[in-house]
Amino acid sequence: MSDIFDEAASFRSYQSKLGRDGRASAATATLTTKIRIFVPATNSPELRWELTLFALDVIRSPSAAESMKIGAAFTLISMYSERPGALIRSLLNDPDIEAVIIDVGSMLNGIPVMERRGDKAQEEMEGLMRILKTARESSKGKTPFVDSRAYGLRITDMSTLVSAVITIEAQIWILIAKAVTAPDTAEESETRRWAKYVQQKRVNPFFALTQQWLTEMRNLLSQSLSVRKFMVEILMEVKKGGSAKGRAVEIISDIGNYVEETGMAGFFATIRFGLETRYPALALNEFQSDLNTIKGLMLLYREIGPRAPYMVLLEESIQTKFAPGGYPLLWSFAMGVATTIDRSMGALNINRGYLEPMYFRLGQKSARHHAGGIDQNMANKLGLNSDQVAELAAAVQETSVGRQDNNMQAREAKFAAGGVLVGGGEQDIDEEEEPIEHSGRQSVTFKREMSMSSLADSVPSSSVSTSGGTRLTNSLLNLRSRLAAKAIKESTAQSSSERNPPNNRPQADSGRKDDQEPKPAQNDLDFVRADV
């Protein structure tokens, strides 16, 4: 009988990798778009700076075609390189585009001068001039920089050029972390990271770009898979070991730490809080299927190779297999553990249709009940004897009493037993925005019987988050309406009873008491409070 269980685990692993072996036998090539990429032909600081300003204007110009904006993005991203053209040729491997790299030797009135002569070249230069004109007109004379003096600056020395290029590229690289998973709520985290680099003196705030330009660039990154592919190739290249890296490469590598595993927070949080905590609840039969699934996914992740952390950015179809909808029970348990022991998980949006409330509460209770558990293998490696282990466990139990303070209760209370997120902010919500696979389990519905008005009034409207808060808000409004109607009805009945003769009042009161004996009702707001 044990063979079939081993085969089931092996089958799960095979199922995760099914269809990935071999090469396509059919013609699967797609149509391509021609992209013109302007790169400097020399290391002249003045030429490179003028070409950088040209690319900035193209991206914000409403008359520029998308292919033209993509080419300008390639120009900006590769400007830090000594030979941008060689960098693009070596790393660009995109079947969707046909890159035409144009070496620029000089600039005229802010646009590249075409080396070839003739009417065709003149028409192209006039078209580029119109793109720059519309960019400036649409911005009402504003420049891409917060400080307009940077736009009119004439850079002739290499040190100033390096500072300017690194600052511009750092702002572009910061955008990619949230460009796919949460572009609409990305400004707060982007501002924090920009402030960090300013504080560390790694960027020059004089070359800070306006929020309007950054929004245009963020939208371009969200829409263009080709630009993201090129940036991922650069990330994988700069992560490799070797000789000393330049300043620009180091800051790109640093930002890459935020980009890795974007959109896969659910998968890695399940491993961290569901498996590595080693709580006894993992022995439940209900978890065995999900454990086999997560084991197969970990093996698949390793087989994908260095591109695995970027599968969401690259829009690879395999990413859907890593969504928590494929292992909902284990994920729900892990989220219960995470929201109890990790303060940073309080901002994570877990309002998903496949959240199982019972296993979520089980995770919360396991984290509290097993606080102070000792890993025997680690204790043996540290050479701890039984007395030291007992003393350590007792110390943790004593300090865990303080975990039941208001801060922890407030953190756990953000998460409803039914899966609705109550309270909390929206920072880093994007990290859970991976594609959703529905598990087929019925979603939890909320009971809305009338209950105590004090509890309804005790929930402030500001505590309801934007995600999943609509049903909760409607429930509270309906509850308060029913309570108000009941209060009016009781007031009317009381006024009527006061007008009755005194000799009839006891009988009427007795009849009313029998007819209106309140029945035990479930608290309407039980789903607002966590099971603490």
From Swiss-Prot:
InterPro entries: Paramyx_ncap
Feature: compositional bias, Low complexity: 451-471
Residue segments, region Disordered: 425-444, 449-471, 487-532
Region called Ntail, residue ranges: 403-532
Main location group: virion
Localization per Swiss-Prot or TrEMBL: Virion; Host cytoplasm
Segments of skewed composition (Polar residues): 491-507
One MF annotation (Gene Ontology) recorded for this entry: RNA binding
Annotated RNA binding sites: 178, 193, 258, 352
Region (Ncore): 1-402
Entry keyword set: Capsid protein, Helical capsid protein, Host cytoplasm, Ribonucleoprotein, RNA-binding, Viral nucleoprotein, Virion
GO cellular component term, pick one: host cell cytoplasm
Pfam families in UniProt: Paramyxo_ncap
Comment, domains: Ncore is globular and carries the regions required for self-assembly and RNA-binding. Ntail is an intrinsically disordered monomeric domain in the C-terminus.
Similarity comment text for this entry: Belongs to the paramyxoviruses nucleocapsid family.
Subunit: Homomultimer; forms the nucleocapsid. Binds to the viral genomic RNA. N0 interacts with the phosphoprotein (via N-terminus); this interaction allows P to chaperon N0 to avoid N polymerization before encapsidation. Interacts as N-RNA template with the phosphoprotein (via C-terminus); this interaction positions the polymerase on the template.
Task of the protein: Forms the helical nucleocapsid (NC) in a ratio of 1 N per 6 ribonucleotides, protecting the genome from nucleases. The encapsidated genomic RNA serves as template for transcription and replication; encapsidation by N is coupled to RNA synthesis. Forms the encapsidation complex with the phosphoprotein protein P. Before encapsidation, the newly synthesized free N protein, so-called N0, is chaperoned by P.
Name under which the protein is recorded: Nucleoprotein
Organism field: Hendra virus (isolate Horse/Autralia/Hendra/1994)
